[in-house]
Amino acid sequence: ISVSVSFIFLFVLFGAILDTAGGGKYFLNLAFALVGRMRGGPAKAAILASGLTGMISGSSVANTVTTGTFTIPIMKKTGLPAIKAGAVEVAASVNGQIMPPIMGAAAFVMAELLGIPYFTVVTHAFLPAVISYIALFYISHLESLKLNIKGLPEKEVPNLKKTFFGGIHFLIPIFILIYLLLFQRWTAAS
């Protein structure tokens, strides 16, 4: 377990450094650039941003604070009731706990106790995590239809190309981490 604990610390540190460097804001802007114009765009952007932020933080509380302080007021501004805006953000942020590659402390402890590679835990968690985010996206779409909530005006949505390339350096450490975990079978013991 001591190997797992030190590994957890490194992943939490990785997420904290990436977020402090602006990675959380980058993922938020990228999410709004991708889905902000859609019907119920702010709710969908909150879900997408929480999924992306959850990949690096593994903490539902950190995820909610990082994305929710920005997304909840925008969801409310477009007509989503406050309680539903909060529910969307919390549900999406809690799902960050099951979004690979970080997945919170439970995944590391699970791999250690079961004696299986962390890679195995990550690959088995990926599909359920994606399905949960698709379900949240669909529910927010249905709620947007029911409440007749439109997307954000074009002028309020960041430019996708400019946003993506303006923060592409935040994706490099994530791709390196995924490469090490998946292709080099990097584990807590290595």
Predicted regions and their residues:
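Core transmembrane alpha-helical segments of multi-pass membrane transporters/permeases
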Residues: 1-25, 189
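Hydrophobic alpha-helical transmembrane segments
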Residues: 5, 43-45, 122, 171-172
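Helix-loop-helix module between adjacent transmembrane segments
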Residues: 14-20, 49-63, 92-98, 128, ...
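Hydrophobic transmembrane alpha-helices that form the pore/transport pathway of multi-pass ion
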Residues: 30-96, 106
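Alpha-helical transmembrane segments of multipass membrane proteins
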Residues: 51-52, 94, 109-113, 175-179
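Helix-coil boundary and interhelical linker segments in multi-pass alpha-helical membrane proteins
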Residues: 111-127
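Long, contiguous bundles of hydrophobic transmembrane helices that form the permeation core
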Residues: 123-190
